[in-house]
Amino acid sequence: MASVQLRNVTKAWGDVVVSKDINLDIHDGEFVVFVGPSGCGKSTLLRMIAGLETITSGDLFIGETRMNDIPPVERGVGMVFQSYALYPHLSVAENMSFGLKLAGAKKEVMNQRVNQVAEVLQLAHLLERKPKALSGGQRQRVAIGRTLVAEPRVFLLDEPLSNLDAALRVQMRIEISRLHKRLGRTMIYVTHDQVEAMTLADKIVVLDAGRVAQVGKPLELYHYPADRFVAGFIGSPKMNFLPVKVTATAIEQVQVELPNRQQIWLPVESRGVQVGANMSLGIRPEHLLPSDIADVTLEGEVQVVEQLGHETQIHIQIPAIRQNLVYRQNDVVLVEEGATFAIGLPPERCHLFREDGSACRRLHQEPGV
């Protein structure tokens, strides 16, 4: 196992900068997830760690060794791609041992490692089969096993579940989490799926347009996003945003006016907040309340009702703000499209963002953070 450090790492192709001044510390044995929208630079960052892309400037360390000029084969990293990339004419055992064979490993060593990894990944009964006889989940386990038998110090996974259906993704997500707990290897995982990020990671790195937007534990990013981008990206359905104006400030409180002229005091850091400033109030769909238990409410017309069985998502058009809000409630809520529906804003669950997108730190203590 090994730690990974990036110091002021930048990647550019000509005038196009795809990774900007990246500074990261990934500790020995950590499971770190790079997450962000398409084109944010997460796969490029992973490929620089693997040695498949050169670093334009900055330094990469694996353990105590600077890796900028070290070829991929000598870095002690193993990589799993979105594509399984299995040889169709080779058996599972032959696919898993292929890299060791090229490296000149002895047959006894290859067999021992393949058998050990096959037991861990529940592939022992499939070692003689060809890839065409395997399910998608089994093929992905073979691809992971091929990397594991090389005993890398750092394990890199680039969107490994993207080709699987929804049920298999859930199953493989659980298996990868168990695998990490069992092996204790340093793992870096790339995904655009924030559910994968939240459920797998010890630490999440949110990337936006080639920069690190925020690094933290999953619940920290969910409850205390550093800016509006992170707030909108982490969580599903995404956070609701309302335009507000600051009407007063106090110690550890800011009062804002909603578009319907109602005012609400928010428990957030008030340092540097100016009366009269235009800001954005954020509230997650699951944190909105029924109107009968809230002091501050918004009323609108139901546009869409999504019944998911275990929960209901209601899209409400609020005339005062000329936009839809999403309200999410556990269990079934029976309401007709076109009906009038009111929702409440709990001050302690609200977020406040400046015009530049940065967050005013919430002061309400959330569990697990």
Swiss-Prot record:
One Gene Ontology term of the molecular function aspect: ATP hydrolysis activity
What top-level branch of life does the organism fall under?
Bacteria
Q: Does the keyword field hold Nucleus?
A: no
An example of a Pfam family matching this protein is ABC_tran
Q: Outline the extent of the ABC transporter domain.
A: 4-234
Q: Where are the transmembrane segments?
A: none
Where found?
Cell inner membrane
Q: Name one GO cellular component term.
A: maltose transport complex
Topology versus the membrane, per the UniProt entry?
Peripheral membrane protein
* Residues forming coiled coils: none
Q: Which PANTHER family match?
A: MALTODEXTRIN IMPORT ATP-BINDING PROTEIN MSMX, MALTOSE_MALTODEXTRIN IMPORT ATP-BINDING PROTEIN MALK
Alphabetized NCBIfam families for the sequence: PRK11000.1, PRK11650.1
This protein's assembly is summarised as: The complex is composed of two ATP-binding proteins (MalK), two transmembrane proteins (MalG and MalK) and a solute-binding protein (MalE).
Q: What is this protein called?
A: Maltose/maltodextrin import ATP-binding protein MalK
Q: What gene is this protein translated from? A: malK
